[in-house]
Amino acid sequence: MKPVTLVGHRHDCPLHGAGVVETGSADYTFNGKPVARVGDRVSCGALIVSGSTNYLIGGKAVARQGDETDHGGVLTEGDADWLLE
């Protein structure tokens, strides 16, 4: 089980260094922050490319700590109050 990633959570990009998740669901928040999903953007311009295969929001897989971006980066933060496989 992995913590769900929210807007403002950290990521690490091998091309651009550390940054944060910038976009998420416009319709679904958790603990006051939009939930990040596959296709959402991080601060270096990369897109999230992996997420939970078991939970979708707006037809998109929910991103979790450890999921990846299209720059080869990794989401390094998640909210431990919501865990997904």
Specify the residue positions occupied by each region the protein language model found.
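Intrinsically disordered, low-complexity proline/glycine-rich segments
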Residues: 2-85
